């Protein structure tokens, strides 16, 4: 695994974002997909070249001049590169470059077995959908739910919003999904056709996407199954799983599919959750995601929702480059009594949580939703179930305010998520330097649909985002068997420059470190305002790798709203019984946020809310800084 950089937009002022570019240590697998770039000419020329060489072709929407060639006469997965076909393309004078796509693994997450409210719904499973309205059913804790009832009573159901389910397909003929299915926004990238219907298997293993779709957009009051969180929204099927291996082209094409029609992309999959994998998006997918947040939805940005992972306490979602991306909203899960699910991974990049099952409790404590071939289920689970619930809540907020940007949605998530009655047996709830309460597993709490739509309705778009390299430590530092080296880095957060960052959103610690056993490594970072983020926890089960991390961007959301100026502290050490040793080669601090206070212009309706608290802090800070400027001016005149 190695790192790389990608530039993004004028706001970055030429800054390179450090991102993940991966090289697997495993023996490569080659697919029948090729990335082809032409010297000149458009789609017609590409179709001509492809036809002459026996390929099918698709234009890649996120890059000019790049095409996806696929050859149905080749095996979908083989150990040897097809030199004949690659050289055939490379020798064509119209072709600038041709690259056969390597295959890699992506796994569905959480695919495992396990009344009186003033809302009139006649769907038979509605009373079992405790995550929508929890009255204590299935031994749950009353009131511990997504508070969708308040949003629905305000008239918000997700109308005018389309959610794309990137998965193994959806049963769009299902009577509870058919009326809300958006065929125009759907596509099957596994079969290259516009019909993303799941491939049949005897064990129904390809029901994953259909279940996720039902959580979001199942129709209401049709006497079938249950209802979606945003039952007035449209759902699009993007079939891209269910093939021997994933490729960068298929992932990138899925993430960038119809970005002016699809508002929210929901992903309940990622690298293998085995406690030893460090993996994430490749070059094209990173480019597609950057393109999505910059250009999607007419420039407001595509909203990417990601399941944080199902590796449990033996894994860390900061080793997943999708869940830990700044461009995604990473969602964890709680069970219906507020405890953590046994499969929950914890990490500092998780923004919030929703609900799923995950302990051997009441058989009706799973997630009720649609299933294949017109059926219903009570057994959907994992963070796979959590991400679509979040996508549904975000659809309600978008209906309330279609002008919300991808960053607005993250700010709303931080400000309206609630601790409620969530309980993490391992990590305490803490407050960051500006008073925002967070947890290492649950993020800023469980989503509250009612609170989010009410705040979204009056929301003013947050100020422009800037990016600052806060500094870098380049001197190698040995990590002994015992004890933790402490490194410090003092930064002015680019103050006085056009890319000054005053109010933090995301912070990345880009780290290069060698270790005799990567899984025993623990990394913490403390901000100038005293907030400690656990960037990497021990992964005891399987991570025996000696390769360490190479320019890996560990991300934290825990310092949201803080002032980045001052001294940052990085601690590294080994946790475990066997003695280990390592060397920190590099630590670079990347700061992302705004120069002006993001909440100054927001309307406060609840004076006990996090928004009211944050706005008060901002006003006091602005006043203090104004006084300081005045004093300097007066003293300067004297």
UniProtKB/Swiss-Prot annotation:
Glycans are attached at residues 375, 514, 524. Residues 26-109 form a propeptide. PROSITE patterns: P_HOMO_B (PS51829), SUBTILASE (PS51892), SUBTILASE_ASP (PS00136), SUBTILASE_HIS (PS00137), SUBTILASE_SER (PS00138). Residues 1-25 form the signal peptide. Keywords: Cleavage on pair of basic residues, Cytoplasmic vesicle, Disulfide bond, Glycoprotein, Hydrolase, Protease, Secreted, Serine protease, Signal, Zymogen. The active site is at 167 (charge relay system), 208 (charge relay system), 384 (charge relay system). Serine endopeptidase which is involved in the processing of hormone and other protein precursors at sites comprised of pairs of basic amino acid residues. Responsible for the release of glucagon from proglucagon in pancreatic A cells. Belongs to the peptidase S8 family. Furin subfamily. This is Neuroendocrine convertase 2.
């Amino acid at each position: 695994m190695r790192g790389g950089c990608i530039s993004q937009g004028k706001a970055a002022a030429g800054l390179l974002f450090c991102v993940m570019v991966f090289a697997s240590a495993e023996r490569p697998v080659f697919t029948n997909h090729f990335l082809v770039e032409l010297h000149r000419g458009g789609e017609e020329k590409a179709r001509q070249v492809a036809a002459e060489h026996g390929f099918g072709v698709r234009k890649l929407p996120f890059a000019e001049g790049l095409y996806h060639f696929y050859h149905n006469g080749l095996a979908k997965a083989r150990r040897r590169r097809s030199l004949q076909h690659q050289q055939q393309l490379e020798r064509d004078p119209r072709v600038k470059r041709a690259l056969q796509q390597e295959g890699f693994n992506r796994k569905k997450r959480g695919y495992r077995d396990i009344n009186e409210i003033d809302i009139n719904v006649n769907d038979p499973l509605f009373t079992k959908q405790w995550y929508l309205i929890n009255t204590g059913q299935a031994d749950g804790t009353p009131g511990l739910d997504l508070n969708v009832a308040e949003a629905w009573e305000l008239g918000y159901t997700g109308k005018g919003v389309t959610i794309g389910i990137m998965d193994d397909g959806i049963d769009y003929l299902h009577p509870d999904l058919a009326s809300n299915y958006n065929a125009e926004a759907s596509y099957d990238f596994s079969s290259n056709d516009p019909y993303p219907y799941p491939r049949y298997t005897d064990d129904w293993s390809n029901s994953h996407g259909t279940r996720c779709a039902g959580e979001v957009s199942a129709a209401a009051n049709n006497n079938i199954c249950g209802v979606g969180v945003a039952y007035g929204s449209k759902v699009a099927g993007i079939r891209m799983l269910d093939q021997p291996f994933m490729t960068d082209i298929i992932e990138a094409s899925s993430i960038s599919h119809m970005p002016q029609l699809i508002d929210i992309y929901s992903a309940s999959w990622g690298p293998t959750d085995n406690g030893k994998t460090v993996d994430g998006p490749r070059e094209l997918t990173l480019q597609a995601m950057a393109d999505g947040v910059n250009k999607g939805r007419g420039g407001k940005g595509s909203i990417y929702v990601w399941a944080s992972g199902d590796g449990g306490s033996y894994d860390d979602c900061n080793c997943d480059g999708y869940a830990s991306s700044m461009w995604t909203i990473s969602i964890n899960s709680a069970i219906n009594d507020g405890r953590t699910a046994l499969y929950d991974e914890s990490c500092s990049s998780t923004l919030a949580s929703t609900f799923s099952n995950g302990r051997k409790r009441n058989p009706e404590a799973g997630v009720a939703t649609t299933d294949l071939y017109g059926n219903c289920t009570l057994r959907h689970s994992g963070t796979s179930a959590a991400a679509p619930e979040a996508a549904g809540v975000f659809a309600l907020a978008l209906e309330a305010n279609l002008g919300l940007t991808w960053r607005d949605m993250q700010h709303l998530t931080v400000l309206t998520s609630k601790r409620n009655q969530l309980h993490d047996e391992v990590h305490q709830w803490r407050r960051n330097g500006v008073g925002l309460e967070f947890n290492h597993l649950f993020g800023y709490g469980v989503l509250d649909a009612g609170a989010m739509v009410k705040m979204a309705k009056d929301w003013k778009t947050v100020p422009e985002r800037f990016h600052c390299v806060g500094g870098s430590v380049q001197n190698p530092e040995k990590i002994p068997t015992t004890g933790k080296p402490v490194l410090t880095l003092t930064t002015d957060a680019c103050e006085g420059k056009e890319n000054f960052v005053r109010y933090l959103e995301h912070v990345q610690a880009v780290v290069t470190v060698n270790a005799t056993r990567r899984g025993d490594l623990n990394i913490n970072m403390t901000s100038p305002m005293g907030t400690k983020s656990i960037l990497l926890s021990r992964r005891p089960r399987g991570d025996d790798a000696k390769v360490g991390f190479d320019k890996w961007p560990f991300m934290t959301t825990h310092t949201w709203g803080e002032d980045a100026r001052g001294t940052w502290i990085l601690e590294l050490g080994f946790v475990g019984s066997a003695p280990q040793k390592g060397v920190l080669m590099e630590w670079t601090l990347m700061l992302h946020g705004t120069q002006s206070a993001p909440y100054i212009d927001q309307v406060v309706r609840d004076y006990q809310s996090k928004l009211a608290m944050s706005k008060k802090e901002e006003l006091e800070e602005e006043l203090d800084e104004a006084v300081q400027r005045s004093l300097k001016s007066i003293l300067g005149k004297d």
